[in-house]
Amino acid sequence: MEKVYILRWYGLFQPEQLREWEISQKATFNLYLISGKKKYSKKKIHYYIGKAERKLLSDRLNDRNHHINDFSSINEIWIGTIINKKAMHRDVMLVEKMLTSYFVAEGELLNSINKSLPEKNIYLINEWIHYKHNSECLRLPKISIGNMMPDVIIYKMDNCLNKYKLFVSNKLKVTE
């Protein structure tokens, strides 16, 4: 069975901006993307993709043993919600698995789990929204995780070869 997820990411948060904004929203945010410099790293940017199944995602980031504490400085945080269906635990797990399995080849990912792709057809569509303006982010910094993550990620069975293939579309363009 095929699964389709539309993810709406809000971002370019700094940690101190996130909680107040999140409280003011009606949506439940289940996923997050973090980029920054790891302790003792001068230039290299590292990334972390995670899930939170709490009322407030920002509470998860405040956990004492969370990976956010591995960063000496945070470049950005994006928080995401699945907008085309009520996200159940298995949906959040599947989306996190797709994101980490794609991104592990792209950058310095701190995640140590979920590096293998799922065994079903999955379609992910990512929308990037500027949290202050509530409008689409048309330009992001080159090293932004929102710029590195494709807008569309498709993982599906190639029936001719009888194996799964990964398809991506980096940035969708508006047509006139």
Regions found by a protein language model. Name each.
Residues M1-Y47, K51-E176:
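Boundary/linker segments flanking structured domains
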